[in-house]
């Protein structure tokens, strides 16, 4: 297990800003890109990127990658998301009927992206892991949904209304979790843009809110390599079995977080071909 707190203690603020993540609580109004760009400008960074688009009116957890951590974006995008929201039914139905139909939208479902989405409009399979009613007030329903990354909640509500035969649309939506990033995380709760502006010139406070990019080790299992092979592997060469600090057993195509002690090397993909254990997907060069 990699001790993220220990790694963070050793880093300078420059190193954290070069390879870190901030868990932003997105407000209603701006686009996800605008939020990301705002963070870039006020922190004086070269670039930023976000881990999964939220519509302008949607609020909540929007992790923002800083500088070199932007290369990690693709590794986080597919992680599960969790939302709370309010839907409006166009006609009243009993709670029993609503719960019954909601069960039809739990598990593997087929979804066609909305007309205004940026992806190609072709039917895709997604998994809804939990879809439940929290509270009802006439035709307005407070709900919670835990879904696979890439699931469109607005479309989920629309399709639910169609299946009910009365129609439905989403009134409000808030993302409360994006993979390992949560709004109420004990160490790294989401912070507002206003709070970020307040701490941006206070190094001690800024350090508190930046999550080291090494947090990727909580997504992909950790593999330790021998210290003497680290420099060669940092140059983009593959990992051979002889470079491993111990024996590992992973399926081919699995992704791994590679470390030499507590030094992050990168994200690699298992191939197990002719003594080659894994090939690089992302390598973190030393930060000078």
PLM region spans:
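Ser/Thr-glycine-rich phosphate-binding loops at phosphate-binding pockets of nucleotides
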Residues: 31, 147-155
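Residue-level signal for inorganic ion chemistry
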Residues: 64, 85, 156, 233, ...
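Histidine-centered acyl-transfer/condensation active-site motif
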Residues: 139-146
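Accessory RNA 3′-end/elbow-binding domains used by RNA modification enzymes
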Residues: 1-54, 118-123, 129, 140, ...
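Short, flexible turn/loop "capping" segments at secondary-structure junctions
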Residues: 14-17, 77-80, 135-138
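Active-site-adjacent structural elements in enzyme catalytic cores
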Residues: 62-65, 117, 134, 153
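Glycine/acidic-rich beta-strand-loop module
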Residues: 47-76
